[in-house]
Each structure stands twice: as C-alpha cells, then as structure tokens.
Amino acid sequence: SFAFVVDEEMYGRGAAELMRRGMRAEICVITEPTSNVICVGNASCMEFRLTASGKSGHGASRADGNAVKSLMRFYEIFERRVMTELDVRNSDFPMSPIINLGRFEGGYGGWVIPSKAFCEVLVHMHPSISYRDGLDIVRRLVKETAEELGAVVELTMLHGCDGFILPQTNQYLHKLKQAYSMETGQQPKTGLIESETDGNALYHKGGIPCIVYGPGDIAYAHSSQEHVSIKDVIECYRVLRRFINMVSGSRN
C-alpha cells in the first residue's frame, strides 16, 4: 500500500488520521530526505517555550530588570548544559542533540525596558532518551540555571515525541539493505534520522515498525534553497522498486 499524508510538521496529524482509518502494516518505509542513508531509528524530540520576567522602566534609565538581556544570558548557559546532558556516545548510532532556537521575542522598542521576553526551542535527541526523561532534564536545568543567575524563567512545553531504533535483525531492514546493494553495487550506509517524522507516531501509536529512507539532504528542507537531485530520486526509486518486488515475490 502507498499512503500520502499531510501535516507531518504539525505533529503527524496525517499519520494519526491514517491510523484512525485502520491502516496496519508489518513495515512502513517513510521517504524523508536522508541522503539515501537507510535510517533504522528516529530521534526523540521536545519543543518548548522559555519566558523570562523582568521589570519595565524608561529606556533612558539605568535600572535593572531587562527581560531580554536576562533571557539572553540564561539561554547561552542553558543550551550548553542541554548539549552536554543529552549527548549519547555509548550507542551503535551515537548522537549529540540538535538544538534550534527558532524564535526570540521581547520588548516594545528602545524607549521601554522590556519586562517580558520569550523564546521557542526545538530539541532532537538520541532515541534512547524518552521525551519524559528529556523533559525532566530540561526542567532541572531551567531551575538550576535560573537560580544561579538570579533570573525568573518559566518553562512551557509545546510538544514531545519518543524515538525508536529497529532491531538489526528486522527482516524488512535486511531486504531493503539487500535491494540497495543490488541496485547501486555498494553497501548501504545506516544511521538515525535526527528529526521527528511520521515514524514516531506510526511506531509508538500504531505499533508499525518504520524505516526512513529517501533522497535529498535535510539541511535544505524547509529552506529557500530546498532541492533534491534527480539522480538521487532515481536511485531511491530503483531501490524501493526492487525492495517491493522482493517483499511481494514479484519478478517485475
């Protein structure tokens, strides 16, 4: 079966609808931009907002209480600590966390000392770290860092997902690697996709094992330079066609 779903960036709403309609499978191959690396696992993730409180005042006064400056100081230290605590080396697929400071806002203009500032942060981490465990670490680091700096910072969770790693003995993983070798004449590279995909929901909420494999470099996705090489698309098509034929027993 082939399924085309929407709203993957909106927490997998299309995949959730697919499951509500009763879709079941022994394996799902998701075509995300993995640079044609066969990804046997999917990162966990957390998305949250940090809000700093200060004290408003006239922009020409020497008063303290600038919430924007407070949050800037806080965030610089906080991110370094998150990078250290969520780094996983003792794995067949090691991964350091990916942290994106995607939004930072505060204040009204130069004549007013801002009393509030907030930022929104997305963290992807090794699948061995659950969303709950990651959240506990972030909560602790927010508390410790704020107390150390004498800052007032509030954490608001926006979204989270658990990752996974497929067993290397999975028969469909073996067949896909075999199909790759037969079509390209090379041994496939395997790894983790270091982003949330529909696989997170399908694996944990639908009980469907997932492999993520597709053309394109994720660095260009969601950017003004988004593109995919035609050569890579054709290679992926040939590999998946052979894989489907192997699974179905077809000779075509």
What does each model-found stretch correspond to?
Residues 1-47, 51, 252:
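Acidic/histidine-rich catalytic neighborhood of metal-dependent amide-processing enzymes
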Residues 40, 47-252:
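Metal-dependent amide/peptide-bond hydrolase catalytic core
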